[in-house]
Amino acid sequence: MSGDHLFSPFQLQQHILKNRIGVAPMTRMSSQQDSVPRQDVLDFLVRRAENGAAMVYTEAIVTDYESAQGYPGQARILTQRQIDAWRPVVAKIKAAGALAIMQIFHCGRMGWPEVNPAGRIIAPSAVAPAQ
């Protein structure tokens, strides 16, 4: 396939990617009680890189403590323990020749106030989306 560029190297800003295959972010709601991602989630992301993906997006990572969480099980990267959990994953993804990309996430109006640490929803609009 002479016109197929899927498996050819690609430059993305300063990064040279081995191909154009990326693993889309998946919000799996699989973190522990303290919002540290479980080991099986981290292993899953590393395996995607080891199996040939050039870009591996994390699942949705909550942006702050009080307002971004919208439902149970969301990972964060705010405390040192959370940062330390993500650090080896990024290193292993890079060691496999892939680029680790974090999906920064804020739930906004779609959040559940009962699971948000602040007990409220913060969003740019007061209009609730249709359910």
PLM feature spans:
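N-terminal capping/small domains of soluble enzymes
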Residues: 1-107
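Non-globular sequence segments
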Residues: 91-94, 99, 105-131
